[in-house]
Amino acid sequence: MGPRLTRVHAPIAMKSRPRPGQAAEIRFVVEANHIIDFAVDGMPAVLATPWLIWFMEHTAREAMLPHLEPTESTVGTLVDIEHLAPTPLGQIVNCRAQVLSSDGSQFLFKLEAFDEQEKIANGLHKLNVINKARFAGRVARKTKPE
């Protein structure tokens, strides 16, 4: 057996830690670039699930940004979203992310989204707080020279 490898993680400082219950919201209007790409032959133009998830994930990130040091950022590690209802072009969507818990540098969020009539999605999202320089180093090691 070879030598045992031990990873040394850069400490996560954070300005402050969000507490359970703290939340953030993002509102957006469903535009043409947000709709499903198969809205043809009688299929109505509605908000595509990948776009909905993008906005919901960014809502959790917005909740974290005030707590981060300039050397820190976040990366998503889990997305578990149930898309419950269609939302047509032009509707306003309100996304909400609420901190449920934290464990070290990992934060768990409850996510919800509502259009002008009803709840359209809910789920969970995990974010990790990372050191930007260390993360960039990991990416650089995977990048192939051109």
PLM region spans:
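Catalytic strand-loop segment that frames the active site of acyl-thioester-processing enzymes
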Residues: A13-A48
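A generic structural signal for short beta-strands and their flanking turns/coil linkers
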Residues: Q22-I26, V75-V79, L89-C95, S105-F107, ...
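Hydrophobic beta-strand-centered segment that forms part of the acyl-chain substrate-binding groove
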Residues: A60-N94
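HotDog/MaoC-like acyl-thioester-processing domains
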Residues: P88-L89, Q98-E146
